[in-house]
């Protein structure tokens, strides 16, 4: 029987000038996904994927590092300008936006797309620490 050669598909370098940076900032983590204008993912990163564990994932510094990593990966595909969609109540919202700008991406618009219920599900009980 012929042996299969273990070949991995190489990433194709796309040439995309502008896109959308989706920042999902929760109380536990920050996920940054950079897509083209149609919503196809070009690069992504998160605080957890960079090795932050536990409560360190929810820090603004972790969000900054995640945004930098995603921005660098997208700039390899020719990305220059991004619109930013921010979702969630987390600590890393502003830090991630600043990191995208510092990495060299030009930010054209910032939108808050946090879903707000029209009085839907009951929220979790308040924490008593």
Curated annotation (Swiss-Prot):
GO terms for cellular component: ribonucleoprotein complex; ribosome. It holds the Pfam family Ribosomal_S11. SUPFAM superfamilies: Translational machinery components. GO terms for molecular function: rRNA binding; structural constituent of ribosome. GO terms for biological process: translation. Transmembrane segments: none annotated. Keywords: Ribonucleoprotein, Ribosomal protein, RNA-binding, rRNA-binding. InterPro entries: Ribosomal_uS11, Ribosomal_uS11_bac-type, Ribosomal_uS11_CS, Ribosomal_uS11_sf. The keyword rRNA-binding applies. Gene3D superfamilies: Ribosomal protein S11. NCBIfam families: PRK05309.1 (NF003698), uS11_bact (TIGR03632). Part of the 30S ribosomal subunit. Interacts with proteins S7 and S18. Binds to IF-3. Located on the platform of the 30S subunit, it bridges several disparate RNA helices of the 16S rRNA. Forms part of the Shine-Dalgarno cleft in the 70S ribosome. This is Small ribosomal subunit protein uS11. The gene is rpsK.
């Amino acid at each position: 029987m012929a042996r299969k050669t273990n070949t991995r598909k190489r990433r194709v370098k796309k040439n995309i000038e502008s896109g959308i940076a989706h920042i999902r900032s929760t109380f536990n983590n920050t996920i940054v996904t950079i897509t083209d204008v149609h919503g196809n993912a070009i690069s992504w990163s998160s605080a957890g994927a960079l090795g932050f564990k536990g409560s360190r994932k929810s820090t603004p510094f972790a969000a900054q590092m995640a945004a930098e990593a995603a921005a660098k990966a997208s700039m390899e595909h020719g990305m220059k300008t991004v619109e930013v969609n921010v979702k969630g109540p987390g600590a890393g919202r502003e830090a991630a936006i600043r990191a995208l700008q510092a990495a060299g991406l030009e930010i054209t618009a910032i939108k808050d797309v946090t879903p707000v219920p029209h009085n839907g599900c009951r929220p979790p009980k308040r924490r008593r620490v």
